[in-house]
Amino acid sequence: MTDPERTSDLHARAEKIRRDMGGAEKIVRMHEEGDRTVRQHIEEFLDSGTFREIGTFSRSLRVEERDHTPGDGKIGGHGNVENRPVTVFGDDISVLRGSSSIVGTRKEHRLYERSLAMGIPIVHFGETGGARIPDIMGSEGISEPGGLSNWRSDAIGCQWPQ
């Protein structure tokens, strides 16, 4: 396979992940119920053609979930609103109800870091099913979700009411 063929294959795989999300049948059901996907929310919010996604190929760390967790239930990146840069992310409820796990949380963390470094706003389209219990069990899982909320507070100088 040549480099152009590899590049074309990579783009085709990314497009399939973006199109299929957590499964075509789930997307159809959402539309029948009058709901939109998080991708649709993001595309309608941002200026047309400006969304640059990160982590398209990410998926669950758990081997038994890798084949059905595109993006690990989180979609995010950078784009523009009225020609101004913004970071945007959301919970993909077509993938395990948008539940949080280690990889999705890391992706969120990376978006927060980049947004704060660039000094741009963050918009979150939230509709999560909570945390994935198997992913938050054990030392690695327990350290991830809480670490993100503490990091957010420290990074933006936020103080929580006591």
Locate each region found by the language model.
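Terminal-region recognition feature
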Residues: 1-162
